[in-house]
């Protein structure tokens, strides 16, 4: 089973960590095994934190809508998978949380389900499965945070902030292109005006 604590793995993770190190003028590392290099270990930790932080907002590439989760036949428990960042009811309310590795319904105050539940899932994706603009955003944001915490060069901060802003803008464009958003549909006020 994969570890979702370290969801950024292999050559892609090494490349991302080296990009973070390069942002402050540090030489690249050839491996992340053992975390012998303190800077590489810190960069890796920040990279994984930022990866989870950005993905937890929910984007077109990691939201799965209308998924039915079925309880175990004997225990009536639904396992809360390690790659779930958030479960929401299909009405958009976040009534389901992780309690002891199982789905817990805060409304009924129970982790036992007689039947399946239909939810929208924000799922933690592997780094390689994400669109390029999101990988770029994660690395630039992690680089800026790494600089702030361990290096603190204001001239580097300015450059990294510009790169992060550009990366975020590219992600917003991606969402607009692939999100299927429509200003005439999904807004109660606009729908009311159109049906007059």
Swiss-Prot record:
Pfam families: Tube. Structural component of the short non-contractile tail. The tail complex is involved in viral genome delivery. Forms the 12-fold symmetric toroidal domain immediately below the connector protein gp8. Once the tail tubular structure is formed, the interface between gp11 and gp12 generates the proper environment to interact with the six fibers, each made of gp17 trimers. One of its GO terms (cellular component) is virus tail, tube. It comes from the Viruses. It comes from Escherichia phage T7. It is found in: Virion. Interacts with head-to-tail connector protein gp8, the tail component gp12, and the fiber protein gp17. Disulfide bonds: none annotated. Keywords: Viral genome ejection through host cell envelope, Viral penetration into host cytoplasm, Viral short tail ejection system, Viral tail protein, Viral tail tube protein, Virion, Virus entry into host cell. Belongs to the tail tubular protein gp11 family. This is Tail tubular protein gp11. One of its GO terms (biological process) is symbiont genome ejection through host cell envelope, short tail mechanism.
């Amino acid at each position: 089973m994969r570890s979702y604590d370290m969801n950024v793995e292999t050559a892609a993770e090494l490349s991302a960590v080296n990009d973070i190190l390069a942002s402050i003028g540090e030489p690249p590392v050839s491996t992340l095994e053992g975390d012998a290099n303190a800077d590489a270990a810190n960069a890796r930790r920040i990279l994984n934190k930022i990866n989870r932080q950005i993905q937890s907002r929910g984007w077109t590439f990691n939201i799965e809508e209308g998924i039915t989760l079925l309880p175990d036949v004997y225990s009536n428990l639904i396992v809360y998978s390690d790659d779930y960042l958030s479960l929401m009811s299909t009405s958009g309310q976040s009534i389901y949380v992780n309690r002891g590795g199982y789905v817990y319904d805060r409304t009924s105050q129970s982790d036992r389900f007689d039947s399946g539940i239909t939810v929208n899932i924000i799922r933690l994706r592997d780094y390689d499965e994400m669109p390029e603009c999101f990988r770029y955003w994660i690395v630039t944001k992690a680089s800026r945070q790494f600089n702030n915490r361990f290096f603190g060069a204001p001239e580097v901060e300015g450059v990294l902030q510009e790169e992060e802003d550009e990366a975020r803008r590219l992600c917003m464009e991606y969402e607009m292109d692939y999100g299927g958003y429509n200003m005439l549909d999904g807004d109660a006020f606009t729908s009311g005006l159109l049906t007059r």
